Regions:
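Bacterial Sec-pathway N-terminal export signals of envelope proteins
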Residues: 18-62, 66-72, 183-185, 221-259, ...
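Short segments within alpha-helical structural elements
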Residues: 195-223, 366-423
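Sec/SRP-type N-terminal targeting helices
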Residues: 37-41, 54, 109-137, 187, ...
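Periplasmic alpha-helical coiled-coil/stalk elements that build and connect Gram-negative outer-membrane
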Residues: 24, 48, 133-247, 254, ...
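Small/polar, glycine/serine/threonine/aspartate-rich low-complexity segments that form flexible
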Residues: 64-104, 276-309
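Bacterial Sec-dependent N-terminal signal peptides
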Residues: 1-34, 57, 410-411, 417, ...
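Amphipathic alpha-helical coiled-coil segments and their boundaries
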Residues: 25, 32, 39, 108, ...
Length: 423
C-alpha cells in the first residue's frame, strides 16, 4: 500500500513538472522556428557588405597587358628623313606593332560622401531585413494560441465526458440492482449501458484528437507538451504601437531617407590621385623610340577632379520615385493600423460577449444538475423512464460543455487581443 502511495505521488509530481504555460510555449516556438536563424545571417551579411563598401577607400590597382597593330603611326616627314640620312643618322620611325604591360593605380581623396552613403544604406537595409524577420517570427505566437487553446478545450471536453460516464455508470449499477429486484426492465439497463459506451467512444475520439494536437504543438515548440496550463484572464489595452510591423514600416521609411541623401552625393565632384606605369614600346619619349625601337619603363602620376553631370538628368525623377515609395509605405502602415483596429474591436466585443454569457452559465448548470438529480430520484421510484433521465444527463453535460467553451473562447480572445497589441 505504501509503495502505491509513493508511486501515485511521483506521478502527480511528474504531471505538475510537465505543465506548460502559454508564454513558455510561445517562447519555445520562437526559438524553435527555423526563421530565427535569419537574424545571425542578416547580421553577418550586413557586416560583410559594409566592409566591402569601406574598402572603396583602398587604392584600386589594375594590371593590364596589350598588343596592338595600327594602320598608321607617327613618322618623320620625308624632308626631315633625308636630312638625317645626309647627317649619317638612320631614323627608323615607329613600328605599327606596339606592346604594353602596365599597372594603373587610383586613390580616392574625396568621393562626395558616396561611400559613407552606401555604408548607411547597407546598414539600414540590414535593419529592414531584421524587422521583416521579427514580423514573420511574431506570427508564430498566433499559431501557438490556436493549437494551445484548442488543446485546452479538448481537455475540458474529455473531463466532462468522464463525468458523464461516471453518472451513467452509477445509474447503470442502480438499474442492475432494480432489474434483479424486478422493478426495472432489462431494456432500461441496456439503454443506459449503450449510452455509457457511446460516451466512452466519443471520449476515445477526443483523446485521439488531443494526442494529434499535442504532437503538433510539441513539434512546433520543440518541447514535449503534455499538460498545458489554463492561463489566467487578462485585460489588454487598445494599442498597436508595439507591433513589429510598425517597426518594419518605420525602418523602411528610414531607408528611403538614407537613399535620398545618397542621391545628393551623386551630384558632387570627386577628387583622386592616379598613377600609371608600364613597360613596353613605344614609351613616352616618342622621339627616342623613333630612333631606337627598344622597350622602356614609363610612368605618370597626377591628380584628377571629375564631376558626372549626367546625374543631374535623373536626379529629379529619382527623388520623385523615392517620394512615391514613401507614400506606398505610409499607406501600407495606414492599412495595417486600420485592420489592426478592426481586429481589436472584434476581439474586445467577443471578450465582453463571452463574459456576459458566462454569468448565466453557473445558474444554468445548477438548474440542470437539480433537474438531473430529480430525474434520478423519479426513475428510482418509477415515475419516469430511462430516456427522460438520459435526456437530463445530456442536458446537464451540454450546459457544462457550453460553460467550458465560453471560458476557453473568452481566454482565447483575450490572448489574441494581447497578440494583436503585442503586450
Amino acid at each position: 500500500m505504501k509503495e502505491k502511495i509513493i508511486t501515485l505521488v511521483l506521478l502527480m509530481l511528474t504531471s505538475v513538472a510537465q505543465a506548460q504555460t502559454l508564454e513558455e510555449c510561445q517562447q519555445a516556438a520562437e526559438k524553435n522556428y527555423p526563421i530565427i536563424k535569419q537574424y545571425g545571417l542578416i547580421a553577418q551579411t550586413t557586416e560583410l557588405t559594409v566592409k566591402n563598401i569601406q574598402k572603396g577607400w583602398l587604392p584600386q590597382i589594375t594590371a593590364s597587358a596589350q598588343a596592338t597593330y595600327q594602320s598608321d603611326v607617327v613618322s618623320w616627314p620625308e624632308n626631315t628623313q633625308r636630312m638625317y640620312q645626309q647627317m649619317g643618322l638612320n631614323m627608323k620611325g615607329l613600328t605599327k606593332d606596339q606592346y604594353k604591360i602596365g599597372v594603373d593605380l587610383q586613390q580616392i581623396i574625396y568621393d562626395g560622401g558616396a561611400i559613407g552613403s552606401q555604408r548607411s544604406i547597407a546598414r539600414q537595409e540590414g535593419k529592414v531585413q531584421e524587422a521583416q524577420t521579427e514580423a514573420n517570427l511574431y506570427q508564430v505566437r498566433k499559431r501557438v494560441n490556436e493549437m494551445y487553446f484548442s488543446l485546452l478545450l479538448l481537455n475540458e471536453q474529455i473531463r466532462l465526458n468522464d463525468d458523464v460516464k461516471a453518472l451513467l455508470l452509477s445509474s447503470e449499477k442502480k438499474l442492475a440492482a432494480m432489474v434483479k429486484g424486478g422493478t426495472a426492465a432489462t431494456s432500461d439497463f441496456d439503454n443506459v449501458k449503450a449510452e455509457r459506451l457511446s460516451v466512452a467512444q466519443q471520449n476515445e475520439s477526443l483523446k485521439s484528437q488531443r494526442q494529434m494536437l499535442q504532437r503538433m504543438l510539441s513539434v512546433f515548440c520543440g518541447i514535449e507538451i503534455s499538460n498545458p496550463e489554463k492561463p489566467a484572464a487578462v485585460e489588454a489595452s487598445v494599442s498597436a504601437s508595439n507591433r513589429p510591423e510598425i517597426r518594419l514600416f518605420n525602418n523602411q521609411l528610414k531607408l528611403t531617407e538614407v537613399q535620398e541623401k545618397a542621391l545628393d552625393t551623386k551630384l558632387r565632384p570627386t577628387l583622386g590621385l592616379y598613377a600609371q606605369g608600364y613597360y613596353g614600346y613605344p614609351g613616352l619619349n616618342m622621339f627616342e623610340d623613333m630612333m631606337s625601337r627598344k622597350w622602356s619603363l614609363n610612368g605618370i602620376v597626377g591628380i584628377k577632379l571629375s564631376w558626372n553631370v549626367g546625374a543631374l538628368y535623373t536626379h529629379k525623377n529619382d527623388k520623385a520615385k523615392l517620394k512615391a515609395q514613401r507614400e506606398l509605405i505610409e499607406n501600407a502602415r495606414e492599412v495595417f493600423l486600420f485592420n489592426n483596429n478592426m481586429e481589436q474591436i472584434q476581439q474586445t466585443e467577443n471578450v465582453s460577449r463571452y463574459r456576459t454569457m458566462m454569468q448565466g452559465d453557473d445558474e444554468i448548470i445548477a438548474l440542470r444538475t437539480n433537474v438531473r438529480k430529480a430525474a434520478e430520484s423519479k426513475l428510482a421510484h418509477g415515475i419516469i423512464d430511462v430516456n427522460s433521465l438520459l435526456r437530463e444527463i445530456n442536458n446537464e453535460n451540454a450546459a457544462k460543455t457550453q460553460q467550458a467553451i465560453h471560458e476557453i473562447d473568452m481566454l482565447k480572445e483575450m490572448y489574441n487581443l494581447k497578440y494583436t497589441n503585442n503586450e
